[in-house]
UniProtKB/Swiss-Prot annotation:
Similarity remark: Belongs to the pseudouridine synthase TruB family. Type 1 subfamily.
Protein keywords: Isomerase, tRNA processing
Physiological role: Responsible for synthesis of pseudouridine from uracil-55 in the psi GC loop of transfer RNAs.
Signal peptide location: none
Classification via Pfam families: TruB_C_2, TruB_N
The reaction(s) this protein catalyses: uridine(55) in tRNA = pseudouridine(55) in tRNA
EC number: 5.4.99.25
InterPro entries: PsdUridine_synth_cat_dom_sf, PsdUridine_synth_N, tRNA_psdUridine_synth_TruB, TruB_C
Protein name: tRNA pseudouridine synthase B
GO biological process: mRNA pseudouridine synthesis; tRNA pseudouridine synthesis
Molecular functions per Gene Ontology: RNA binding; tRNA pseudouridine(55) synthase activity
Domain of life: Bacteria
Gene: truB
Alphabetized Gene3D superfamilies for the sequence: Pseudouridine synthase
Length: 294
């Protein structure tokens, strides 16, 4: 069995499920999962867990993400991104400066509440929102709280001859953030229709775009029996607090027994030497093995 983490660079036009399906065929391994869905049009880092590493994929999914993208001011779309149909147009504000945009972006920092887009996989009454959208049905969408730790403009404002304005941005956010909704809400705050015209995930769960591999690159390496794209399972717990345990504690964990450890964290990644051997969960004043990986 193959075990480990893959830092996959998902390409546009492919769902996260498509990527997993292709890797299962390529690696001839059924036990593969991904750590955080990317929309088909979004490119970038998609953490993949293989074999035993699938047991820690949930901790990669919970980790924060970093995205780089582009906002277009001047019209909105059905999907809140460039793939949708135009639903409304508006003139740019009489005064639209980089200083105004920057100041407005800072108002989104911290905890904010979002309404998921209709074209999303969020479920309401057992059905995904995009299923309602495709049949023209309206449904009340559940609002969710997310955290934005960074939201900044990374390019000058680019005014076009057809009355639009585009600029690039970078955002660091919590799990569950809809960046296209962030682009739309930014436009509303500037009193103009808007949508997200491009997006890529540049980092997720400690993995970065610079070190990611495309499916084509992985296929080429596999054909040469080269597996260096496969990272150790320890990458899957990079966002969890680390606790190094001794030989006695290792034995206790292997028998599923509780430990008294000097920590108040709700979850710990227990390491013996350089190897992660368990995920420990705080129970009362002790830590109980939640997942034993040895």
């Amino acid at each position: 069995m193959i075990n480990g983490i893959i830092n996959l660079k998902k390409e546009a036009g492919m769902t996260s499920h498509d990527a997993v399906f292709k890797l299962r065929k390529l690696l001839q391994e059924k036990k593969i999962g991904h750590g955080g869905t990317l929309d088909p049009d979004v490119v970038g880092v998609l953490p993949i867990a293989v074999g035993k590493a699938t047991r820690v994929i949930e901790y990669m999914t919970e980790a924060g993400k970093v995205y780089e993208g582009q906002v277009t001011l001047g019209y909105s779309t059905t999907t809140e991104d460039a793939s949708g149909e135009v639903v409304a147009r508006s003139s740019l504000p009489a005064v639209l400066t980089e200083e105004l945009v920057d100041q407005t972006m800072t108002t989104f920092l911290g905890k904010i509440t979002q309404t998921p887009p209709m074209y999303s996989a969020v479920k309401v009454n057992g059905r995904k929102l995009y299923e309602y959208a495709r049949t023209g049905e309206s449904v009340e969408r559940p609002r969710r709280e997310v955290t934005i730790s960074l939201f900044e403009r990374t390019s000058p404002l680019n005014f076009t001859e057809d009355g639009l304005c585009r600029f690039s941005f970078k955002v660091a956010c919590s799990k569950g953030t809809y960046v296209r909704t962030l682009a739309v809400d930014l436009g509303r705050a500037l009193w103009v229709e808007s949508h997200m015209s491009f997006l890529q995930r540049s980092a997720s769960a400690g993995l970065t775009l610079e070190t990611a591999y495309t499916l084509g690159e992985i296929a080429d390496m596999v054909s040469k029996q080269e597996m260096s794209f496969l990272l150790p399972i320890e990458y899957g717990v990079a966002d969890l607090p680390k606790m190094v345990i001794d030989d006695t504690e290792l034995t206790e964990i292997s028998f599923g027994r509780r430990l008294s450890l000097p920590s108040q964290e709700p979850l710990l990644a227990a390491f013996h030497g350089e190897k992660v051997i368990a995920i420990l969960e705080k129970r009362d004043q002790e830590y109980k093995p939640k997942k034993v990986l040895i």
